[in-house]
């Protein structure tokens, strides 16, 4: 379902859910929205919040120092390079006058990182990068698989970069409609 979304307010609300948890661990929680990102969008805030909440919870869980940051920018690649987006998504069912922005959300941390050998299974159910992390950090191993399903349902793509001991960056890009300009009453 497409719902009007004020991006800065939405981001602030999501981060507020994790402020206390980050503070208890001595982590700085930071966000930045690039200037060229439209702030009045239409999308599925429930699914967006579920994905961001899982990524932020993981970033805080697996970090003992530093900063957890949420960055929002536009995917500037030309359309032919965005082939990972499904050909049928809610964005394509709208009228030709609807403007779509490919908005990329990135969650970065200074946590334990992920070994390259674990990437192939990272978004599969019941998988954590290392069995010992399940014992130390807990969790079901379902979070990233659910994130992938939700991002897929929104017509997007999710991925990650990481290096053991150097933290991780999880990114997902989804097509979001720009809200139509509201008519101003004549003076």
Per-region residue spans from a language model:
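Conserved catalytic submotifs in the C-terminal HATPase_c
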Residues: 1-6, 23, 28-39, 75
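Glycine-rich G1-box
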Residues: 20, 112-113
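Short alpha-helical Gxxx[C/S/T] motif in the catalytic ATP-binding
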Residues: 138, 143, 147
